[in-house]
């Protein structure tokens, strides 16, 4: 029997990583699209050579430098679609390998661009994590890893939160850790009860 596939999505700064960690604490295997990209870009990763062929400046120390890729994407309007043509099939293959080895009743698939890339059809349900815009902005800019302009550029590429809310099966407002933990536990129990019915 294949596991129940719960997709986890939400815009940047909404609490996806924290929510995924809560599922992992409950014993639910988590596949993370961003982590898959990091593995593929790391030394020896399957995308190092192909990405370096597209953007030689992105090759640093045998790995793909994401900062150099961001600069390339900002400077060349044709860069992102060419990069995605390499990345998305490789990430899909990584996800398929994870699913092929999953021996559990539920898996969580953490996919930031789940709706934008049409992955929702592969899910049994989708959990959207969300937060008020002021909290989202504070979380992202408080990390100190990007500028406000970079944050706005990422938001512009992501589907608006209100559209995601309309499409999601489940919605979690990530306002506090204990409330989120309780929600995750209740959702896991609900999925298991529904599967047993």
Curated annotation (Swiss-Prot):
GO terms for biological process: coenzyme A biosynthetic process. Pfam families: CoaE (PF01121). The keyword Protein biosynthesis does not apply. One of its GO terms (molecular function) is ATP binding. Its EC number is 2.7.1.24. It catalyses: 3'-dephospho-CoA + ATP = ADP + CoA + H(+). InterPro entries: Depp_CoAkinase, P-loop_NTPase. Pathway: Cofactor biosynthesis; coenzyme A biosynthesis; CoA from (R)-pantothenate: step 5/5. Signal peptide: none annotated. HAMAP family: Dephospho_CoA_kinase. PANTHER family: BIFUNCTIONAL COENZYME A SYNTHASE-RELATED, DEPHOSPHO-COA KINASE-RELATED. Belongs to the CoaE family. Catalyzes the phosphorylation of the 3'-hydroxyl group of dephosphocoenzyme A to form coenzyme A. This is Dephospho-CoA kinase. It comes from Cereibacter sphaeroides (strain ATCC 17023 / DSM 158 / JCM 6121 / CCUG 31486 / LMG 2827 / NBRC 12203 / NCIMB 8253 / ATH 2.4.1.).
């Amino acid at each position: 029997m294949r596991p129940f596939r719960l997709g986890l999505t939400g815009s940047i700064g909404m609490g996806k990583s924290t929510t995924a960690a809560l599922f992992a604490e409950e014993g639910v295997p988590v596949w993370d699209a961003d982590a898959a990209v990091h593995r593929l870009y790391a030394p020896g990763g399957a995308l190092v050579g192909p990405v370096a062929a597209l953007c030689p400046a992105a090759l640093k120390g045998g790995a793909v430098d994401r900062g150099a890729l961001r600069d390339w994407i900002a400077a060349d309007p044709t860069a992102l679609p060419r990069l995605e043509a390499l990345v998305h099939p490789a990430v899909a293959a990584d996800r398929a390998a994870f699913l092929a080895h999953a021996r559990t009743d539920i898996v969580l698939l953490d996919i930031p661009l789940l709706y934008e890339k049409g992955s929702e059809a592969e899910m049994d349900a989708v959990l959207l994590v969300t937060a008020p815009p002021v909290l989202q902005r504070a979380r992202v800019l408080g990390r100190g890893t990007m500028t406000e302009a970079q944050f706005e550029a990422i938001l512009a590429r992501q589907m608006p939160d209100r559209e995601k809310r309309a499409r999601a099966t489940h919605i979690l407002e990530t306002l506090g850790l204990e409330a989120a933990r309780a929600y995750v536990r209740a959702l896991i129990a609900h999925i298991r009860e529904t599967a047993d019915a």
